[in-house]
Amino acid sequence: MGTVSSRRLWWPLPLLLLLLLGPAGTRAQEDDDDDYEELVLALRSEEEGLADALQNGATATFHRCAKDPWRLPGTYVVVLKEETHRSQPERTARRLQAQAARRGYLIKLLHVFHDLLPGFLVKMSRDLLELALRLPHVDYIEEDSSVFAQSIPWNLERITPARYQADEYQPPNGGSLVEVYLLDTSIQSGHREIEGRVMVTDFGSVPKEDGTRFHRQASKCDSHGTHLAGVVSGRDAGVAKGASLHSLRVLNCQGKGTVSSTLIGLEFICKSQLVQPVGPLVVLLPLAGGYSRVLNAACQRLARARVVLVAAAGNFRDDACLYSPASAPEVITVGATNAQDQPVTLGTLGTNFGRCVDLFAPGEDIIGASSDCSTCFVSRSGTSQAAAHVAGIAAMMLSAEPELTLAELRQRLIHFSAKDVINEAWFPEDQRVLTPNLVAALPPSTHGEGWQLFCRTVWSAHSGPTRMATAMARCAPDEELLSCSSFSRSGKRRGERIEAQGGRRVCLAHNAFGGEGVYAIARCCLLPQANCSVHTAPPAGAGMGTRAHCHQQGHILTGCSSHWEVEDLGTHKPPVLRPEGQHNQCMGHRGASTHASCCHAPGLECKVKEHGLPAPQEQVTVTCEEGWTLTGCSALPGTSHVLGAYAVDDTCVVRSRDVSTTGSTSEETVAAIAICCRSQHLAQAS
C-alpha cells in the first residue's frame, strides 16, 4: 500500500467529535481497526518535513529507531514529565485528540501508562507530531519500532565452578524463592520439562505476523519461549530447577514484537507487583530492538522497584549500546559464548559486545525443551539462551540471599565469573578493551562471601574528537565511585576528575586538542556505610609536583586522578615508589590539578602497589594480592606517551605509545599505580 504525503482528510467537526469522544464512536473505532490503519497510512507525511517543523518552538524531543527497517511510523509513545499527576496522561491524550480533530485528523488512543511511566500510546499521522510535542507536560515522544527474539548439556557444566565440577550438575539451590517473568512468544506449558512450573498469564500484546500466507502453527508459535523456559528452570536441562516462571506473550509466531508491546508487558509486571508484592523477582528480556529511550527508561523504573532485569545483548555482531533493552544501565546485559568459551558466531553475525555487556554466558547449541511435542528437545543458539542462563543463576543467588540489591547481585555475578578465558581477537579492535572478558558461573558456595569488597569497572561512551569534549562514567545508585581514570587511543587527553552532579559523583575525562576522543573509566564498589569525598590540590607551578592528601581523620585513599588545561604538560620524574607512610596522598604533575578520593568505612584498609618499567613499554600492569580488591588505577604522572589507565578485575593496566613515534626518550618510566583495599573488620568477623 502506498502513502500519500501531506494530505489531510477534512471531516465535519461535529461528526469528528462524536467519533472521538462519544461512547458509540469509541465502540465503532474499536470494531474497525483495519480501516483505521489504512487511514493512518494515508495520513503519513514525508520525513523531510518533520525536522523543520520541530525547530519551530517545540519544547519536547522526538526519538526514533536508528535502523529504518525496524521503524513503525504512525504509532507513537508519548512520555510525560516525571512529576506529572497520575491523571495527566489520559487528560493530555484527550487534549491531543480534541486539538487534532479541529485540524481534521483522527487519533486512536491505544494504551495509557500509569504505573510504569507517565504516558500513552497512540496511532496518528506524523503531521501531528509538532502539535503533540508542544503540549504541556510532554517530555518526549518516541516512534514505535520492532524488537526480535535473539535465538538462532555442556552449558550446565560450564557454569559450575571448577573446584566443584563433577559428572552431575549440582547447583547450590533450585532458585525456589524467586519468580521469573519471561517476555517472549507463547509457551507450551504442558512440556514435561516445565509442566507445573510455568504460569501462563492472560497478558498478550503482539503485532500481526508478516505476510498474508503465514500459518500460525502452534509448535512454531511456542518454540522460542518454550526453549527459554526450559533453560531457566527445566527439570532436566534447566539452570534453576526450582524457580517458577510467568509467561507474558510480547512476540508473535515469527519472534517479532514492538517496543510498545514490551512496554505494556513491563507495566503488567509493575501492576502485578503493586497489587500482590512477592519476593525476589527476575524479568528475562530475550529480545532486542534498536536503541529506545522509552524502553530504557521503563527498565530504569522497574529496577528502582527492586526488580532484576536480565537482557540478551543481541545477535548482530555489533556494539550492544546501539540496542535496547541491552543498552539500559540498569539491565544485566548478557553476550553469548560457546563450549570453548569463545564468542558465538551465527552465520555472518554473532553475539553483540562492548561496554554495555556485563558478562557472557553459554549461548551455542543449548539443549532445551522443544514445542514439537511434550517430550521433545531441541538445540538452539543465541544471546537469548545466554540471558536465560544468567536469569537462572540470578534466581539461585537471590534464593540464597533474598535481600540482595540489583547492584549487589550484578557485582556478585561479575566477581564469580570465569575471567580472561575469551579470545578477544574475535571482537573489533576498538571494542576489545571495552568488552568484559567474563563468562558467568555459579558462586562456589552460598555463604561466606559477605565480607568481600566487590568492585567493577564502568566505561563511558566515547567523547568525540573536539578539544573541549568530555566523557562521563557513573556508578549505580547503590555503588560508591572510589576512583576515576581516563584512556585515549591517540594519547591526547587532559586527564580526569570526579565531580558531583545531581547529588551523585561522576567520573569525567577530558579530550585534548588534536585528540580522537577519550573514555572515562569509573571504579564502582559496594562499600556499606561509607563516607567518601574528594580532596584537590591545584597546579603547583614549580617543584616536583602537586600532592593531594586525605586529611580527614580516619579517611583512607582509594583512588588518584588529575587533569590539566594545557595541551602538553612536559615531563618530570618523581620516584616510582612512594616513601613509607605516604599512602594517603596522590602525586601529580606540577602543571595539573591532583585529586585524592578518600573514604571512611568500617574495617576499610588500603595499600598502594606500584610497578614501573623503562620505556618503551606497550603495557605495564600491577595486580592486587588475593583477598584484596583493586579500587584505584592510575599511571605515573608526567609520562608523555601514556594513553591512559584502567582496571581489569583486580589488575591495574597502563597503556602507552611507541616512544619512537612521540619524540620521547626511553629514559622515561612507564608505571602502573594500584590502590588495593579490603574490609578487614568484616573479614575477621566472618
Curated annotation (Swiss-Prot):
Pfam families per record: Inhibitor_I9 (PF05922), PCSK9_C1 (PF18459), PCSK9_C2 (PF18464), PCSK9_C3 (PF18463), Peptidase_S8 (PF00082)
Alphabetic keyword roster: Apoptosis, Autocatalytic cleavage, Calcium, Cholesterol metabolism, Cytoplasm, Disulfide bond, Endoplasmic reticulum, Endosome, Glycoprotein, Golgi apparatus, Hydrolase, Lipid metabolism, Lysosome, Phosphoprotein, Protease, Secreted, Serine protease, Signal, Steroid metabolism, Sterol metabolism, Sulfation, Zymogen
Compartments, as annotated in UniProt: Cytoplasm; Secreted; Endosome; Lysosome
Cysteines paired by S-S bonds: 221-253, 321-356, 455-525, 475-524, 484-507, 532-599, 550-598, 560-586, 606-677, 624-676, 633-652
Notes on how activity is controlled: Its proteolytic activity is autoinhibited by the non-covalent binding of the propeptide to the catalytic domain. Inhibited by EGTA.
Active site: 184, 224, 384
Enzyme class per UniProt: hydrolase
Example GO molecular function: low-density lipoprotein particle binding
Peptidase S8 domain: residues covered: 153-459
Major location (coarse): cytoplasm
Domain Inhibitor I9: 75-147
Source superkingdom: Eukaryota
Modification Phosphoserine, positions: 45, 686
PTM remark: Cleavage by furin and PCSK5 generates a truncated inactive protein that is unable to induce LDLR degradation.
InterPro entries named among the record's database cross-references: PCSK9_C1 (IPR041254), PCSK9_C2 (IPR041052), PCSK9_C3 (IPR041051), PCSK9_ProteinaseK-like (IPR034193), Peptidase_S8/S53_dom (IPR000209), Peptidase_S8/S53_dom_sf (IPR036852), Peptidase_S8_subtilisin-like (IPR050131), Peptidase_S8_subtilisin-rel (IPR015500)
Signal peptide positions on this chain: 1-28
Segments of this protein annotated with the region C-terminal domain: 448-686
Residues at the site labelled Cleavage: 150-151, 216-217
Residues bearing glycans: 531
Keyword NAD: no
Gene Ontology CC: cell surface; cytoplasm; early endosome; endoplasmic reticulum; extracellular space; Golgi apparatus; late endosome; lysosome
Family: Belongs to the peptidase S8 family.
Function: Crucial player in the regulation of plasma cholesterol homeostasis. Binds to low-density lipid receptor family members: low density lipoprotein receptor (LDLR), very low density lipoprotein receptor (VLDLR), apolipoprotein E receptor (LRP1/APOER) and apolipoprotein receptor 2 (LRP8/APOER2), and promotes their degradation in intracellular acidic compartments. Acts via a non-proteolytic mechanism to enhance the degradation of the hepatic LDLR through a clathrin LDLRAP1/ARH-mediated pathway.
Name recorded for this polypeptide: Proprotein convertase subtilisin/kexin type 9
Lineage: Eukaryota, Metazoa, Chordata, Craniata, Vertebrata
Gene it is expressed from: PCSK9
